[in-house]
C-alpha cells in the first residue's frame, strides 16, 4: 500500500505485471517490453461549479468556474511548452469536459482536429443523489451509507425514477442513445464497465494507427482507465484521486502494457495539487 501511495503522490511508475525486459512475439522476434511504442494523454476537466459547491455532480451539465478555466489554460500551456500535438481528442458529452478540451486545443492552435464526444466517457452517474449537496445528503441518508456510495467500488446510490428529469433518457442531449444504455445510477464498477470497452473499441485502434490521442474526461472515468492500465485491484482504485486539469501521460509497449505514467508539469505544483485534492476528499468524508 505504501508503494501504491508513493506512485500517486510522486508519479513513480507502477507496472508490477511486466517483470521481463524482453519477450518473444508470435514471429519469435524479441520485443523490448520497456520500449515506448504508444503514448496517451489523459486529463480531467477544470474545476466545475458543483466541485466548488460540494454537490454530487455526475451527469449534471455544469459550467467551469473561473478557476477551472484558468486550470485548463495552464494545462494547455504545459502541453504546448512540452511540444505536444494531437490528431484526435476524445471527450465526454458534458460541457465542463468539452470546454476544457476547447481551451487546451486552442492553446495548442489545434481546434481543427476531430473532437469526438461520447457519453461512455461521462462522469459516474450518481442516481438519486445527483445534484444534491453532500452534507444534506449525509443528513438524509446517514453518513455511513453515503460514504459507501462515494468510496466503495460496487455499491451504487439509489436509482432515479424513470420519469425523473435527471434521467438521461429524458434529456435532449441523449435522444439518439438507446435508453437501455443510459444509467439510472452507477457504482464505480459500473463506470469502469462502461469506459473500458469504449476505450478498447474506439481509442486503441486509433493509437495503433499512430494517432496522437488526448482524452479529456472526468475523475471516475479516468479512474477506470487507470485501473485498467495499471491493473489495480478494486480496493486500490477507490483510493485514487485525480486532480483537475493536470496532464497525465501514459506510455505503453507494443503489447499495450504500461511502461510508465507521470503527470506533466512542475513537480512541486503537481504534488501540491495532488495533496490538495486528497485533503479535500478527506475533508468531505469527515464533513459528511
Language-model region placement:
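Classical Sec-dependent N-terminal signal peptides that target proteins to the secretory pathway
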Residues: 1-18
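Phosphate-coordination/substrate-recognition cap region in phosphate-metabolizing enzymes
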Residues: 23, 27-31, 35, 75-168, ...
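ANL superfamily AMP-binding
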Residues: 69-83, 198-204
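Beta-strand elements within well-structured catalytic alpha/beta cores of enzymes
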Residues: 39-43, 116, 211-221, 225, ...
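GST-like fold's C-terminal all-alpha helical module
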Residues: 190-206, 211-219
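Glycine-rich N-terminal loop/short-helix segment of MobA-like nucleotidyltransferase
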Residues: 48-62
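Short catalytic helix/loop segments, enriched in acidic residues and glycine
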Residues: 58-74
